[in-house]
Amino acid sequence: MKRERGRRGRKRVCSFCVDKATSIDYKETSKLRKYVTERGKILPRRISGNCAHHQRMLTTAIKRSRNIALLPFSTEA
C-alpha cells in the first residue's frame, strides 16, 4: 500500500519577475506589507513565491523601511 505524502500545490511565480522589477523600493510600504505577516515577520520564499534574488532584495527593503519607521517591527499585542 502506497501512502501519499503531503500535498504539492502549484508553484507560485515571482511577482517581481513578472513585472520585470530591477529594484524594490523601501518607500513603497503598500507593496512591502503584502510580504509581512500580521505579527511583523517576513514571509518565506516558499509561501510568497519570490525567486531568491528578489527575496533578498525584498528582505533588505523591509529592513530598511523598518529602520526609518515606515513599517513596524512587530505589532502591539
From Swiss-Prot:
Q: Which InterPro entries match?
A: Ribosomal_bS18, Ribosomal_bS18_CS, Ribosomal_bS18_sf
Q: Which PROSITE patterns match?
A: RIBOSOMAL_S18 (PS00057)
- Keyword Ribonucleoprotein (UniProt): yes
Kindly state which keywords UniProt assigns to this record, in alphabetical order.
Ribonucleoprotein, Ribosomal protein, RNA-binding, rRNA-binding
* A GO CC term assigned to this protein in UniProt: cytosolic small ribosomal subunit
One Gene Ontology BP term is: translation
**Transmembrane domains' residue ranges:** none
Per its UniProt record, what Pfam families does this chain match?
Answer: Ribosomal_S18
One GO MF term attached to the UniProt entry: structural constituent of ribosome
What residue range is the signal peptide? none
Q: What PANTHER family does the record point to?
A: 30S RIBOSOMAL PROTEIN S18 (PTHR13479), SMALL RIBOSOMAL SUBUNIT PROTEIN BS18M (PTHR13479:SF40)
What does the annotation say about its assembly with partners?
A: Part of the 30S ribosomal subunit. Forms a tight heterodimer with protein bS6.
For this protein, the record's NCBIfam families field holds: S18
Give the protein's function.
Binds as a heterodimer with protein bS6 to the central domain of the 16S rRNA, where it helps stabilize the platform of the 30S subunit.
Question: Hey, which family's this protein in?
Answer: Belongs to the bacterial ribosomal protein bS18 family.
Designated name of the protein:
Small ribosomal subunit protein bS18
The opening ranks of the lineage are: Bacteria, Bacillati, Bacillota, Clostridia, Eubacteriales
